[in-house]
Swiss-Prot record:
Subcellular location: Cell inner membrane
Keyword terms, alphabetized: Cell cycle, Cell division, Cell inner membrane, Cell membrane, Membrane
Entry-linked InterPro entries: ATPase_NBD, Cell_div_FtsA, FtsA/MreB, SHS2_FtsA
Any one Pfam family match given in the protein's UniProt record, by short name: FtsA
Presence of the UniProt keyword Membrane in the record: yes
Upper classification of the organism: Bacteria, Pseudomonadati, Pseudomonadota, Gammaproteobacteria, Enterobacterales
Originating gene: ftsA
GO cellular component annotations of the record: cell division site; cytoplasmic side of plasma membrane
Main location (coarse class): membrane
Membrane topology (UniProt): Peripheral membrane protein
Protein name: Cell division protein FtsA
Family that this chain belongs to: Belongs to the FtsA/MreB family.
Quaternary context: Self-interacts. Interacts with FtsZ.
Highest rank taxon of the organism: Bacteria
Length: 418
């Protein structure tokens, strides 16, 4: 977050396997976000969220931040930082307390959430997010906001997201070496969900899948609450490796081939064409049947999506045993750079047997022609988190000023009367 004299600015920083992106947004009077600064560079020194060369990744972060500062004409002092790696873990927990007075107060909610998160988590992990799913008061279930309601006992169900302490610490260290403070570390899957999912989709049930370069993040929402989240440590880069191996070419060439000619659906029988790769690498075989390339890409995408489908089925069985509702009426929402592959919707619908859409981030304005592609969903979601912090600060200021006004009126009344 950056507080300037006349602007409310928020900065998102995504340090991914393939790219580092810095985005500067201005929170407008109507609480919309206007993009005013953008900086990116290719990632070096990091793979699947794990830093393997601190100096290299610090250099990338600094370059990305510098570009965004120049475009936005501001100095970046703090950022909202995304995090995704195989050491992310999630668990659902319950907290129960007696209601202190006749009705639920803000303090009761803080207390019951504290109880819910005071559980054993994985060794060397710390909690990133505690997300309330629903509250129950006595025999009243499915309550979203219990403040002011009466009862004897309150229960909360929460979704905990944890990460390995050292993994998070090293990413933060890299950012701080650029003289920038981290306002909050946010799981990438949550950030992407914030950027691409609608409220209706979350209420009806939806699975958001962000296919990045090194990892796949996915989240499942039912009845407006997050029920499950996970990171799969394979994504777009493994497809690139498959192409490189299958056709004996470098990873850079394989990536270019994937972007330029890649698809997960073969053309109609008899219409497969020869692809001339001589412009990419003179040592590479000059012609290749399009079908051969698609075979490699499609088989890997089916495998990756099937890993998510297995987890969806597992959660479905788990909730069914508990007698809890499980429906994904809104289907599957794909995003991330890996979702740009041609015909992915058709391929995914076969795997999930549900409706599928590829989502771009929404609810932003400004320099949107640069950053409305699926590959920027995470960093845009970070801005939405920053916006919410501003909104909360404004609410507290209003509450404080309200009590100040009341106090002054009472004080003035006493002066007049006595």
């Amino acid at each position: 977050m950056i507080i300037s004299k006349d602007r409310k600015l928020v900065v998102g920083l995504e340090i991914g396997t393939t790219k580092v992106v810095t985005l500067v947004g201005e929170v407008l009077i109507d609480d919309n976000i206007k993009i005013i600064g953008f900086g990116t560079c290719l990632s070096k020194g990091i793979d699947k969220g794990k830093i393997n060369n601190l100096d290299l990744i610090v250099s990338c972060i600094q370059e990305s931040i510098n570009k965004a500062e120049i475009m936005a004409d501001c100095q970046i002092t703090s950022v909202y930082l995304s995090l995704s790696n195989k050491y992310i873990n999630c668990q659902n927990e319950i907290g129960i307390i007696p209601i202190s007075d006749d009705e639920v107060t803000k303090e009761d909610i803080e207390h019951v959430i504290h109880i819910a998160q005071s559980v054993q988590i994985l060794n060397e992990h710390h909690i990133l997010h505690v997300i309330p799913q629903e509250y129950s008061i006595d025999q009243q279930y499915g309550i979203k906001n219990p403040i002011g309601l009466s009862g004897v006992r309150m229960q909360v169900k929460v979704h905990l997201i944890t990460c390995h302490q050292n993994m998070a610490r090293n990413i933060i260290k890299a950012v701080e070496k650029c003289d920038v403070k981290v306002d909050q570390v946010i799981f990438s899957g949550l950030a992407s969900s914030k950027a691409v999912l609608t409220e209706d989709e979350c209420n009806l049930g939806v699975c958001m899948i962000d296919i990045g370069g090194g990892t796949i993040d996915f989240t499942i929402y039912i009845d407006g609450s997050i029920k499950y989240s996970q990171v799969i440590p394979y994504a777009g880069n493994i497809v690139t490796s498959d192409i490189s191996y299958a056709f004996s070419t470098s990873r850079d060439n394989a990536e270019n081939i994937k972007i330029k000619y890649g698809s997960v659906k073969k053309p109609p029988l008899g219409s497969s064409k020869n692809i001339d790769f001589s412009d990419i690498n003179c040592n590479f075989q000059q012609n290749l049947q399009q079908d051969a390339l698609i075979d490699v890409i499609e088989s890997r995408y089916v495998e990756l999506l099937s890993l998510v489908q297995d987890q969806i089925v597992h959660l479905q069985k788990k909730l069914h045993k508990k007698g809890e509702k499980y429906e994904l009426l809104s289907g599957i929402v794909l995003t991330g750079g890996g979702s740009n592959i041609s015909c992915l919707t058709d391929c995914a619908e076969k795997v999930f047997q549900k409706k599928v859409r590829v989502a771009k981030p929404f609810n932003i304005s400004g320099l949107i022609e640069k950053i409305t592609e699926p590959c920027y969903s995470t960093v845009i979601g970070l801005l939405h988190y920053g916006k919410e912090s501003y909104i909360n600060i404004d609410k507290k200021k209003k509450e404080h000023s309200f009590f100040e006004i009341i106090f002054k009126r009472i004080n003035n009344w006493f002066k007049k009367e006595f």
